[in-house]
């Protein structure tokens, strides 16, 4: 059988680094929403061997292989699957592409094979894969603390959003290693402060140029550790007009923020 699932991007409406933990991770505070945009994943079972097809990411580096290793260890899951990932979310962009892929496949397999993994267990597996995976399993807009895995649900206005994708790649690991001067500003639903914005603008020229352009038209913010920049609007026409006047080489588009991840509805009727 063949299954098609969404793997949406997330947006960080602010990101405040609180302190470094004893396990070398950082405690953070952030607000998550999802985008009505992202990758598509196609899962085919009844195949002779497992295969991951994703031209943007080398097989051995694909997070899905790590997911399969964890599932084998945790629940002895050994099904052979062919998975094709149609990538739209750039790597190292602050939109959670790999984490979303892993969460979507995990959620789908739990339904397809009736694995009966509780949400608590799914979140535990997600955290083994990475700090951003749990939010895609949770699937609802929220304020997140801890490593980003402790959730307090909130309902936000779903709004048109202009997304700017600089060519710059920013490694989350490197961002935390190199940015030591975390600003103590507060973060809330009206102040989308990001602890990495000043550092990213200083160290990545293209990121700064994109900020300088969009800030002539509207407020703009960094998502996660970057490099994606976003700007929220009250209507599509306004956002689209600004997008249409973007510099010719700037990669940008308009979509909508969502409070609920699409995959939660998609997998309801899956099963074999």
Sequence positions of predicted segments:
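ATP-dependent small-molecule kinase catalytic core of the GHMP/sugar-kinase superfamily
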Residues: 2-33, 115-219, 232-272
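Short, well-ordered alpha-helical segments
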Residues: 61-65, 103, 240
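Short hydrophobic alpha-helical segments that form membrane-spanning helices or hydrophobic packing faces
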Residues: 105, 231-232
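Conserved glycine-rich beta-strand-loop-beta hairpin in the small C-terminal domain of fold type I
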Residues: 226-229
């Amino acid at each position: 059988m063949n299954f098609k699932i969404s793997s949406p991007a997330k947006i960080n409406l602010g990101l405040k680094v609180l302190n470094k933990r004893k396990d070398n991770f950082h405690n953070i505070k952030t607000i998550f929403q999802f985008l009505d945009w992202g990758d598509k994943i196609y899962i085919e079972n009844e195949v002779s061997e497992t295969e991951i097809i994703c031209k943007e990411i080398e097989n051995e580096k694909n997070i899905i292989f790590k997911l399969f290793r964890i599932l084998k260890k945790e629940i002895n899951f050994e099904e052979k699957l062919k998975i094709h990932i149609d990538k739209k979310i750039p790597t190292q962009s602050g939109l959670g592409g790999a984490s979303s892929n892993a969460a979507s496949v995990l959620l789908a397999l739990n339904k397809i094979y009736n694995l009966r993994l509780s949400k608590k267990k799914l979140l535990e597996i997600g955290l083994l894969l990475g700090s951003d995976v749990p939010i895609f399993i949770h699937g609802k807009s929220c304020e997140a603390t801890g490593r980003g895995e402790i959730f307090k649900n909130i309902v936000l206005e779903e709004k048109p959003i202009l997304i700017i994708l600089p060519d710059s790649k920013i490694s989350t690991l490197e961002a935390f290693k190199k940015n030591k001067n975390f600003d103590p500003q507060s973060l809330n639903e009206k102040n989308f402060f990001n602890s990495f914005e000043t550092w990213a603008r200083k160290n990545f020229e293209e990121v700064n140029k994109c900020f300088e352009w969009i800030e002539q038209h509207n407020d703009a913010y960094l998502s996660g550790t970057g490099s994606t920049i976003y700007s929220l609007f009250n209507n599509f026409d306004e956002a689209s007009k600004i997008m249409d006047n973007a510099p010719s080489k700037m990669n940008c588009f308009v979509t909508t923020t969502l409070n609920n991840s699409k995959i939660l509805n998609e997998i309801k009727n899956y099963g074999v």
